[in-house]
Amino acid sequence: MVRLFVTTAVAGIMLNIAISSFGFAALIRPVAGMNQTVVALESMLNATQKPAAIDYSRLGIRGVRLGMSVEEAKRKLGKPQRDETKPGGKAIGGKIRTLTYSKLTVAAWDGKVYLISTTNPKFVTIDGIKVGDNSQKVVKTYSYGSQSVQGEVTRLTYSNDQKASNLVLELKGDRVQKIIVGTQLN
């Protein structure tokens, strides 16, 4: 049930606001005769409201991809600093194997890579993004992702819903500080 509905037009923008028992909603749309600034604003809003999906084949770092065998990942990356295997726990079962390199972690469940994480600028994504790159390069490469902010860190998430997988880029200021590629275990 809508408790309040307001429509107003300011500077060529129509703003509809609705407040209901379900929460708050706002719709911003241009009115007839809008100027170029309004067109740019609308395209930015549309882009950020519809995060870009990412193809599963693009989910990887330095040639290591989700779903590949842990042995193949080890061959590509060389001998790890640490190689640990632990039980997966009651919820998922199986075994979790973690390969640790210099600022790079690869985790596998039952022999298949499900997580790759790095803070090392030497390791790039399949599309060429690395730690230290700026947000403009990220947006040019991947478009806009789903965005969340926690403290000083902004997380841009690009999902592949068909395989319940994603690429997460953590930015501090305008620079990538961490890259995470992962898939849901089930």
Residue spans of the language-model regions?
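Glycine-rich loop/hinge motif
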Residues: D127
